[in-house]
Amino acid sequence: MNKLILLAFALMSTVAMHAQREKWKVADKGPSIDNYFTPATAEAATPDNEGFIRRWTLLEPIDKPNRGNTVFTDSYLRENLGMEYFKGQFSILPKNGQKVKAGKQKLQWHTLDSKLYNVKLFRFATGLDKQFYGIIFWAVTVIECDEDIPGVRLSVGSNSASMWWLNGNETLLLSGDRRMVADDCMSQRITLKKGTNILRGAVINGPGMSDFCVRFIDENGTPVKNIRIK
């Protein structure tokens, strides 16, 4: 019995790696992207009841083949997520429908509201009939504050590894082959400044599902809700 289980696991791994190499698209997409996302409206959003940010501008996946996720060390992530794949990667404020070129790929940004607290990147990719293994997802959101909010922490869960920048500064790194768990990692204390704050994230995965969740936690461990999301 154990041999059969090991054989089945090996076969599944082989299929996953072959799918990644060949950049298979999904034959049976399963649930529609509409089950997970709605187009963002012009009106600013707010965090949900638990403080999770659901409005994001997501870039269609960038091709980044990896046979497995054990390579996602701190140094690997800083090198491969810190490099520029498209012009203005760390400076532009992307708009819905805007297009960029990453290598030979022409990719489009989509501004969406997630129906779940965790943003289902895998379903975002399959719903658009895009590559879903061996990829990097870029996510950007704009946070508006009426006043400085000091002493908060950026709290993230991601599948698999990810890296996050607030207002251009590296704020949090989630390395290794990991599952998405809410509040899996938290940053040092930071300040959400009065006015506009820009949060950028990059999520990388080889074979496997991809998603993330983000919120800010104050010094008392309470989710920050007095912000607007654009």
Predicted regions span which residues?
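Bacterial Sec-dependent N-terminal signal peptides
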Residues: 1-21
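Accessory carbohydrate-binding/adhesion or oligomerization-edge regions at the termini
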Residues: 20-119, 202-230
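Generic structural detector for well-ordered beta-strands
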Residues: 52, 57-60, 142-144, 189-191
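Short structured motifs
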Residues: 123-127, 138-140, 183-187
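Short beta-strands within extracellular/lumenal beta-sheet-rich domains
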Residues: 133-144
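Non-cytosolic beta-sheet module surface loops
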Residues: 145, 154-158, 203-205
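Aromatic-lined ligand-binding clefts that engage carbohydrates, nucleic acids, or primary amines
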Residues: 150-165, 199
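Beta-strand-rich ligand-recognition modules
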Residues: 166-214
